[in-house]
Regions:
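Adenosine-nucleotide cofactor-binding segment
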Residues: 64-73, 83-143
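Glycine-rich phosphate-binding loop and adjacent beta-alpha segment
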Residues: 87, 135-203
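A glycine-rich, Thr/Ser-enriched phosphate-binding loop motif common to dinucleotide/cofactor-binding enzymes
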Residues: 14-20, 36-59, 71-79
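A general structural signal for well-ordered alpha-helical segments in protein cores
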Residues: 31, 50, 128, 141, ...
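Glycine/charged-rich beta-loop-alpha catalytic/anionic-binding loops adjacent to active sites
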Residues: 30-40, 176
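Short hydrophobic alpha-helical segments of the AMP-binding
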Residues: 57, 80, 84, 172
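Glycine-rich phosphate/adenylate-binding loop and adjacent beta-alpha elements
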Residues: 1-31
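Structural detector of well-ordered beta-strand residues that form the stable sheet scaffold
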Residues: 32, 69, 92, 153-155, ...
Length: 205
């Protein structure tokens, strides 16, 4: 179920109304316990932006010392930076907005690169172990994937208009980078991200 406003035949109104309520009845399988050490205002975003970026990092087995790229520094991107840093990774933030540089560095990124042209990616060619993209628009995927080492992985979580992304097959094949995409995450990983953030004091801002 989407958060809200998504066409859904089962709903009396024809669209989903989301889960923003003081009380709700659900199957216990879907209940996530919030630790007392975690304020609800910090916990709530973890159930969307948090799990959306944590799940790919988990599957990529990001570990201390890994060089991780985060492309797009919005709501998802800032969580990706904080989570990867908390896992001990060296994070390289890529943004087209100069205004996001200070934020990225304050979140713990080792470097923040303003990509006002694709040439700015060239110095990082083949240097990263992994990259997660939160860019919600069409972009040159192969150019960004090129900063990942051969046989490394690139995960797309940003959703462009129309939910479709144009990809250069030859660009990815030349780079030998594994491309995948991810949408939110399962219950087990959601429980993990809540616990991880509580223990490591990773808070959405």
């Amino acid at each position: 179920m989407w958060t809200y406003g998504n066409p859904e035949e089962r709903e009396p109104t024809g669209i989903t109304q989301g889960g923003y309520s003081n009380n709700i009845v659900v199957d216990k399988h879907f209940v996530i316990k919030i630790p007392e050490s975690l304020d609800l205002q910090h916990a709530a975003p973890l159930l969307c932006a948090g799990i959306t970026t944590y799940s790919p990092l988990l599957k990529a087995n990001v570990k201390p010392g890994d060089k991780v790229g985060v492309a797009g520094i919005g709501g998802l991107g800032h969580m990706a930076i904080k989570l990867a840093v908390a896992k001990g990774a060296q994070v390289y933030a890529f943004t087209t907005s100069p205004k996001k540089v200070e934020d990225a560095l304050s979140f713990g990124a080792k470097e923040a690169i303003i990509v006002d042209s694709l040439d700015k990616l060239a110095p990082y060619k083949g240097k990263l172990d992994y990259m997660i993209s939160t860019i919600p628009a069409q972009f040159d995927v192969a150019a960004y994937a090129n900063v990942v080492k051969p046989y490394g992985s690139f995960t797309q979580v940003g959703m462009p208009p129309g939910m479709s992304l144009n990809i250069s097959a030859i660009g990815l094949s030349i780079n030998r980078v594994n491309f995948n995409a991810s949408l939110i995450g399962g219950i087990s990983a959601t429980r993990d991200v809540v616990k991880f953030c509580a223990e490591n004091k990773v808070y959405p801002t």
